[in-house]
């Protein structure tokens, strides 16, 4: 019984391998990069520039604000470490004399 199961599993493995399910080479993926190859019409006229989509506010909210927040957190934690180890402790000296 066990030998029969082994034969069936080997036969199933070979059938799957032949079908391309197992032991198949992964397909090489090609990256799709937007590229404008046609710059002139068939009559020879230069085509107009493509429209540029501006992501002004979206860019500000997704890039600038989070990284400013992360930078302030890092600097605040670093200042706390410096004060904790007495490396830099601001003094309240009055030099008004």
Curated annotation (Swiss-Prot):
Spans through the membrane: 56-75
GO molecular function terms listed in the Swiss-Prot or TrEMBL record = channel activator activity; protein-macromolecule adaptor activity
Q: What is its main location?
A: mitochondrion
Residue intervals on the Mitochondrial matrix side: 38-55
Report one GO cellular component.
mitochondrial inner membrane
Where does this one sit in the cell?
Answer: Mitochondrion inner membrane
Would I find Repeat among this entry's keywords? no
Organelle transit peptide residues: 1-37
* Keyword Glycoprotein on entry: no
Ranges in the topological domain labelled Mitochondrial intermembrane: 76-97
Q: Which UniProt keywords apply?
A: Calcium, Calcium transport, Ion transport, Membrane, Mitochondrion, Mitochondrion inner membrane, Transit peptide, Transmembrane, Transmembrane helix, Transport
Question: Looking at the Swiss-Prot or TrEMBL record, what is one Pfam family this protein matches?
Answer: DDDD
Q: Name one GO biological process term.
A: calcium import into the mitochondrion
**How does the entry describe its membrane topology?**
Single-pass membrane protein
What is the documented function of this protein?
A: Essential regulatory subunit of the mitochondrial calcium uniporter complex (uniplex), a complex that mediates calcium uptake into mitochondria. Required to bridge the calcium-sensing proteins micu1 with the calcium-conducting subunit mcu. Acts by mediating activation of mcu and retention of micu1 to the mcu pore, in order to ensure tight regulation of the uniplex complex and appropriate responses to intracellular calcium signaling.
Q: Which family does it belong to?
A: Belongs to the SMDT1/EMRE family.
Assembly and interaction partners: Component of the uniplex complex.
Q: What is this protein called?
A: Essential MCU regulator, mitochondrial
Query: What gene is this protein translated from?
Result: smdt1
